[in-house]
Swiss-Prot record:
Source organism (scientific name): Mus musculus
Alphabetical GO biological process terms: adaptive immune response; apoptotic process; mRNA splicing, via spliceosome; positive regulation of apoptotic process; somatic diversification of immunoglobulins
Annotated keywords: Acetylation, Adaptive immunity, Coiled coil, Immunity, Nucleus, Phosphoprotein, Repeat
Composition bias type Acidic residues, residue spans: 66-78
PTM annotation (Phosphoserine): residues: 389, 545
Listed name of the protein: Beta-catenin-like protein 1
Record note on domains: The surface residues of the concave side of the superhelical ARM repeat region contribute to, but are not essential for NLS binding.
């Protein structure tokens, strides 16, 4: 407490209710202090009837104690002081454990030791400013002891440990000393930190503010460790974190910062991780995601934070659909019907629903979803979006190009996977209304062909400069150039040309004649389309088996024979 506070001090009269701003300040002050300090404030409130002399006496004691703490903080942080701190921590932890065992039914006997333990945990936050000294936490078994305290009977202690671990694993701090960070993360992983954190999460009551903060800090530890060491995501998920996240997401609680954070951590765990995607499917996670997203089929998110959560859940769903077994679960869970509804409702969720459908139908694994999509009259939904991109795309970050990319990818998947009567229904769409959909396809073709020609000209100029400098264009550089071309519009152009090849091979003369007629009118040729499709075939199937790649290449190139 500083001099200003002392001078402005007024003893608590006990009758007047604190103003809202005073109440808020009191709450903030409570949050920033440990249990011992919080106890002090509670005493001040409870003893409102004490006279001014006693209040002043207590104030002087507080000032003296704060002064002593400041003197202690001024001690320079080095190996010796950290070792001393760890030794004090171990002693207090052991003493508290001993007293709890000796007097299990008499809290008065061990409460003082618990407050002392909490105090030293708070002091250890200073170690987070020196990641080079993290090795001492491991060598002196402090990490092991801290992990043990995550199961402490008093959640105030476990929350204090979580708060400390969150600060120690702060990603910026970890990058300050790679060596110190590696040692700490190794010790945490070896100690099964994820399993212990989940066990602690299970008992926290989020209606209590401090415990809700504990949940938030726990999720921050996971995020920090996942960013520093992505491979730990699999262990964390298997040690119960994935199950807890799903349970927390579907809990009937008002939307808050913790629910948003859960959605974010879930998306992180599923990123490029087939094991976690499979585990989520086994835990009925696809149904949980669909249930949570169903809220947004007719209602827009009410805040920017709720919209961010919605996008995280959509990202998680798209990630899961990379796995064929989850496509089946998505189909059985009526995911197609939900996404189709979202497209029709024209809410903020529409753009993301389109992306989900793209992931659900792509490749041979999407065949069943493609057939079901036609059964639920999805063609009536997708073609209006193909004919005209929404003028106002409300979702932040969604562009007209992304919209057209997903729509064309969906149509390409439908043409690849549909058979029989459903394929006929799809092809008939290209002949109705004087082949207006063929006209739209050709319009998009020239739009993205033009964009590609601009990008290719720029890349050729860069290649020329590289050669002129006497440098060699290696495979890595060629890959980089190809990725840039895909991003500039080649990706969508390949899908457009593939759609052209498919519909021209459908034995519907009207379609083929219209395609050739428009190409001639615009001074273009089949050769350009053939070249784009050949390049598409050469680069298809990355990450798949050689057999699939070879079969798919033959199938695509066969389309060119009758084009």
């Amino acid at each position: 407490m500083d001099v200003g506070e002392l001078l402005s001090y007024q003893p608590n009269r006990g009758t007047k209710r604190p103003r809202d701003d005073e109440e808020e300040e009191l709450k903030t002050r409570r949050k920033q202090t440990g249990p011992r300090e919080r106890g002090r404030y509670r005493e001040e409130e409870a003893t409102a009837a004490e006279d001014t002399a006693d209040d002043k006496k207590r104030l002087l004691q507080i000032i003296d104690r704060d002064g002593e703490e400041e003197e202690e903080e001024e001690e320079p942080l080095d190996e010796s002081s950290v070792k001393k701190m760890i030794l004090t921590f171990e002693k207090r932890s052991y003493k508290n454990q001993e007293l709890r065992i000796k007097f299990p039914d008499n809290p008065e006997k061990f409460m003082e030791s618990e407050l002392d333990l909490n105090d030293i945990i708070q002091e250890m936050h200073v170690v987070a400013t020196m990641p080079d000294l993290y090795h001492l936490l491991v060598e002196l078994s402090a990490v092991q002891s801290l992990l043990g305290l995550l199961g402490h009977d008093n959640t105030d202690v476990s929350i204090a440990v979580v708060d400390l671990l969150q600060e120690l694993t702060d990603i910026d701090t970890l990058h300050e000393s790679e060596e110190g960070a590696e040692v700490l993360i190794d010790a945490l992983v070896d100690g099964q930190v994820a399993a212990l954190l989940v066990q602690n999460l299970e008992r926290l009551d989020e209606s209590v503010r401090e415990e809700a903060d504990g949940v938030h800090n726990t999720l921050a530890i996971v995020e920090n460790m996942a960013e520093f060491r992505p491979e730990m995501c699999t262990e964390a998920a298997q040690q119960g974190l994935l199950q807890w996240l799903l349970k927390r997401l579907k809990a009937k609680m008002p939307f808050d910062a913790n629910k948003l954070y859960c959605s974010e951590v879930l998306a992180i765990l599923l990123q490029d991780n087939d094991e976690n995607r499979e585990l989520l499917g086994e835990l009925d996670g696809i149904d949980v995601l669909l249930q949570q997203l169903s809220v947004f089929k007719r209602h827009n998110p009410s805040t920017a934070e709720e919209q961010e959560m919605m996008e995280n859940l959509f990202d998680a769903l798209c990630s899961c659909l990379m796995l064929s077994s989850n496509r089946e679960r998505f189909l059985k869970g009526e995911g197609l019907q939900l996404m189709n509804l979202m497209l029709r409702e024209k809410k903020v969720s529409r753009s993301s629903a389109l992306k989900v459908l793209d992931h659900a139908m792509i490749g041979p694994e999407g065949t069943d979803n493609c057939h079901k999509f036609v059964d639920i009259l999805g063609l009536r939904t997708i073609f209006p979006l193909f004919m005209k991109s929404p003028r106002k795309i409300k979702k932040v970050g969604t562009t007209e190009k992304e919209h057209e990319e997903h729509v064309c990818s969906i149509l390409a998947s439908l043409l690849r996977n549909l058979r029989g009567q459903q394929r006929t229904r799809l092809l008939n769409k290209f002949t109705e209304n004087d082949s207006e959909k063929v006209d739209r396809l050709m319009e998009l073709h020239f739009k993205y062909l033009s964009a590609m020609q601009v990008a290719d000209k720029k890349i050729e100029g860069e290649k020329h400069d590289i050669v002129r400098r006497g440098e060699i264009i290696d495979n890595d550089m060629e890959d980089e150039f190809y990725l840039r071309r895909l991003d500039a519009g080649l990706f969508i152009l390949q899908h457009i040309c593939y759609i052209m090849a498919e519909i021209c091979n459908a034995n519907v003369p009207q379609i083929r004649q219209r395609v050739h007629q428009i190409l001639n009118m615009r001074g273009s040729s089949i050769k350009i389309v053939r070249h784009i499709i050949k390049e598409y075939a050469e680069n298809i199937g990355d990450g798949r088996s050689p057999e699939f790649r070879e079969t798919e290449q033959k199938r695509i190139l066969a389309l060119l024979e009758n084009f």
